[in-house]
């Protein structure tokens, strides 16, 4: 059976997901993988860019589908409407596809994920890693559910499509989003967490590694200590949440080298961009020369392991 992986992006984000695609291709050479890309428009130029990545790998198949997002207009889109597209996947994918792994564009698949994809999901809608918001009491008071149910990150989400279809979850999520626009902070992620609060699996951290884990003391204690060690020693999926690895000012992740490795393998590597541009970039450069900041230490994998060992 093939592994199905989905992305929901606009045309401008295609270059970034080519890095993710390269990481998938390199770590699944013996697996049939079908890549589903959902968008409202993809240019011929970007389609060719995708083909150049996928075509050298005969076990990879690329499927591109256009989405009618009229049902989503009016929903809160703090970042982009495309994040809502993932709730439509059960409606757009064939009923013969029983599950799909949704990935944000700022991810790397650092090892084979067959075991994850075919895990038991009986009577569960989703499987995700815990989100930093799970430790924020305001999250639960705002969404009105118990903290024991946890709050997960939808940026890496294994979806049980049979469950979604049986419960008509896509339509329920969209309706709840409209009805609760006033309390939503993280649009579809809030909605998914609330409606799947009793039907989600919390995955080991290695399946959605975020830098937040390494910078938070609670993850160096049980029940997370061994999972944090596995993030360093056996990384599976890296999620550069809030640290876009293609933005020079944000490319400071502990796992930045993994993104760089796969980017270099591409026929057309992604060129890093500055958030600050033009004259503002020149002014920032001059300011940094005239007002040098004291050097701050950068967290390394060794630092994480040393801290874990000292906490034992």
PLM-predicted stretches and their roles:
Residues 45-92:
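Active-site-proximal specificity loops/subdomain of glycosyltransferases
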Residues 4-6, 34-36, 63:
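A structural signal for isolated positions on well-ordered beta-strands in alpha/beta enzyme cores
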Residues 126-146, 252-256:
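A short, conserved beta-to-alpha structural element at the edge of catalytic cores
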Residues 34-41, 128-129:
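Short internal beta-strands
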Residues 1-3, 9, 166-312:
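A glycosyltransferase accessory/donor-loop signature
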Residues 23-32:
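Short, acidic, metal-binding catalytic loop of nucleotide-sugar glycosyltransferases
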Residues 9-15:
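Active-site beta-to-alpha loop of glycosyltransferases that engages the nucleotide-sugar donor
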Residues 64, 68, 82-135, 151, ...:
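GT-A fold catalytic core of metal-dependent nucleotide-sugar glycosyltransferases
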């Amino acid at each position: 059976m093939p592994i199905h992986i989905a992305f929901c992006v606009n045309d401008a984000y295609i270059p970034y997901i080519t890095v993710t695609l390269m990481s998938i291709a390199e770590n699944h050479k013996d697996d049939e993988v079908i890549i589903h890309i959902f968008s409202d428009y993809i240019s011929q130029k970007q389609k060719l860019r995708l083909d150049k990545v996928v075509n050298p790998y005969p076990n990879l198949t690329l499927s591109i589908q256009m989405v009618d997002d009229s049902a989503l207009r009016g929903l809160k889109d703090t970042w982009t409407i495309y994040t809502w597209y993932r709730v439509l996947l059960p409606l757009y994918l064939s009923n013969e596809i029983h599950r799909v792994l949704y990935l944000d564009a700022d991810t790397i698949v650092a090892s084979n994920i067959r075991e994850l994809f075919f895990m038991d999901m009986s009577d569960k809608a989703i499987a995700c890693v815990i989100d930093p918001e799970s430790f924020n009491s305001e999250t639960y008071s705002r969404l009105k559910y118990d903290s024991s149910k946890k709050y997960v990150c939808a940026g890496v989400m294994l979806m049980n499509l049979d469950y979604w279809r049986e419960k008509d979850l896509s339509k329920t999520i969209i309706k709840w989003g409209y009805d609760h626009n006033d309390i939503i902070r993280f649009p579809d992620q809030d909605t998914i967490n609330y409606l799947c609060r009793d039907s989600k699996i919390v995955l080991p951290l290695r399946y959605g590694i975020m830098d937040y884990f390494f910078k938070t003391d609670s993850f160096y204690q049980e029940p997370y200590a061994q999972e944090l060690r596995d993030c360093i020693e056996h990384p599976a999926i890296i999620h550069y949440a809030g640290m876009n690895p293609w933005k020079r000012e944000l490319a400071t992740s502990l796992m930045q080298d993994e993104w760089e490795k796969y980017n270099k393998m591409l026929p057309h590597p992604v060129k890093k961009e500055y958030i600050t541009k033009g004259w503002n970039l020149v002014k920032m450069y001059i300011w940094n020369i005239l007002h040098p900041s004291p050097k701050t230490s950068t967290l390394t994998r060794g630092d994480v392991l040393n801290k874990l060992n000292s906490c034992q």
